[in-house]
Amino acid sequence: RTTRNKDEGRGSPQGSPLSPLLANIYMRRFILGWKVLGHERRLDAHIVNYADDFVICCRGTADEAARVMRSMMSKLKLTVNEAKTRLCRVPEESVNFLGYTIGLCHSAQTGRSYIGTRPSAKKIAALKAEIHELTSRRWLWTTVEDRVVKLNRKLRGWSNYFCLGPVSPAYRAIDRHARHRLRQWLRGKHKLQSRGTSRLPDARLHDKFGLMRLCDRPRSFPWAKA
């Protein structure tokens, strides 16, 4: 923890429940003003936000939308994080928002291209790092049941959120990594010399030890969730 907020006399500590509440209050004023002042209709620019993270989706009016946004933020005495602010032309470019990459996707069924969402490379890498930590050598003293329970909990939570768009490539990559890491952990725990998969095939990891296979999970869409 730092004393930056206290020293500067502004802001709230990161992780404080007050932070998202204040963010929603100020963003509500900004979004209402955007609509009431007619910017949404005039610029055909629609705001999508979560707390203080937001994107403005528009057609050919990005420069003007950015100028108006900065002007309104200034009047609300809010500071725009310029390091995280940029103009993005989709589908030539992609943008990351709330862990998803929004950009050009390809349909596996038709082969056609479309603008859609997929889990971002950063979030996939972060999950792989967490799987690696859960199967590191410092956990060799635990049981395989304990490792699988913790791995499955992590995999289930991640896939419950990342279930939109073409997720199969990400799921396959994560499944491979989870199997590889659990296999490495089992070799270390039981001092197995074989480096192949003959003694620890995929079926054994999933069927005997119970490791979750993301590719077999039914798709769970947000509008069907409580």
Describe every region a protein language model picked out.
Residues R1-A226:
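Non-catalytic terminal/accessory segments
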